[in-house]
């Protein structure tokens, strides 16, 4: 059973999709999971498969639209990780308010950018009883530098500095691309074969061509979950990495090595970054379900 819901974060009306077993009712006392999307993704793009897995396993899940995406209010397409972390924390509060949910059994699943954001939340919010981080981005600056030359990076930083001045004088950030296959006109650079496939992806179509703002680059510069990952303990954390992840490389290994127990690392053999979203969702979700059942049920 799926239900489109709304909740408020920082005064903005945000949207999400609540998924629950058909027999869920007031007093069911079911564990709940907040699903935290990746970069520029939405609740109804890629994530239904994750939610369906949780429903079948007896969980109530909330897949959120961050501010500025899907049906949520906010600056369209802008991705400021610390604000998204705030939105996800408020999603926990909403899930705790549901009569079907046990408020003391809440978990987080984050994918890609969301994979690092859930680490930030778990490090400071002990309402979270278990967390799973899938094909995560471990450091925003390191990811933005990937596939760029030093000169391209310097050019991008000059654009960011000019936009900082523009924002304080006009109140607006310049429009920018979320990702391109090269150059300095996007937040991220992706290999051409990935960029071409993403042009037809549902979430990009909904957001009209992966448009964001230059302020997003500034937000990513401050995003460094690798620096706080040791603070997640004693909350148990699972890392799911794709063996051939061409985007996030060894980020999961880095964070796993710095995290404290209880922790676990699962590798999707032969997998690439976007395999977890569809082709191999079932395989990637198996260790997540086992992890959450161990600590929540």
Walk through the language-model features, giving the residues of each.
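N-terminal cap/lid segment of alpha/beta-hydrolase-fold proteins
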Residues: 1-28
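Catalytic nucleophile-loop/oxyanion-hole region of alpha/beta-hydrolase
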Residues: 7, 43, 69-104, 277-278, ...
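The serine-hydrolase catalytic nucleophile loop
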Residues: 39-52, 66
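Conserved alpha/beta-hydrolase
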Residues: 53-71
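Alpha/beta-hydrolase-fold enzymes
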Residues: 107, 119-196
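Short beta-strand/loop motif that positions the catalytic acidic residue
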Residues: 232, 239-241
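Conserved alpha/beta-hydrolase "acid-adjacent" motif
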Residues: 245-251
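Catalytic active-site module of serine/aspartate enzymes centered on a nucleophile-bearing elbow/loop
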Residues: 271-274, 278-297
């Amino acid at each position: 059973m799926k239900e489109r819901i709304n909740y408020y974060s920082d005064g903005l009306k945000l949207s999400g999709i609540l998924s629950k077993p058909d027999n869920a009712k007031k007093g069911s006392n079911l564990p709940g999971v907040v699903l935290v999307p990746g970069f520029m993704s939405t609740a109804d793009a890629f994530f239904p498969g994750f939610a369906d897995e949780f429903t079948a396993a007896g969980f109530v899940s909330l897949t959120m639209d961050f501010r500025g995406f899907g049906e949520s209010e906010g600056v369209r397409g802008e991705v400021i990780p610390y604000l998204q972390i705030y939105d996800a924390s408020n999603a926990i509060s909403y899930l705790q308010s549901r009569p079907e949910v046990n408020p003391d059994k809440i978990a987080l699943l984050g994918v890609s950018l969301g994979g690092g954001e859930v680490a930030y939340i778990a490090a400071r919010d002990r309402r979270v009883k278990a967390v799973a981080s899938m094909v995560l981005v471990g450091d925003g600056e390191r990811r933005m530098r990937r596939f760029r030359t030093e000169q391209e990076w310097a050019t991008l930083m000059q654009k960011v500095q000019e936009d900082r001045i523009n924002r304080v004088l006009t109140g607006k950030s310049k429009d920018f691309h979320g990702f391109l296959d090269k150059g300095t006109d996007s937040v991220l650079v992706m290999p051409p074969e990935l960029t071409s496939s993403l042009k037809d992806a549902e979430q990009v179509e909904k957001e009209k061509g992966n448009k964001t703002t230059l302020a997003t680059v500034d937000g990513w510069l401050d995003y460094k979950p690798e620096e706080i990952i040791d603070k997640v303990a004693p909350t148990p954390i699972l890392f799911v990495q794709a063996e051939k992840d061409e985007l996030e490389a060894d980020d999961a290994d880095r964070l796993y090595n710095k995290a404290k127990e209880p922790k676990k690392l699962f590798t999707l053999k032969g997998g690439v970054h976007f395999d977890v979203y569809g082709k191999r969702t079932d395989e990637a979700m198996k260790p997540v379900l086992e992890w959450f059942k161990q600590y929540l049920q």
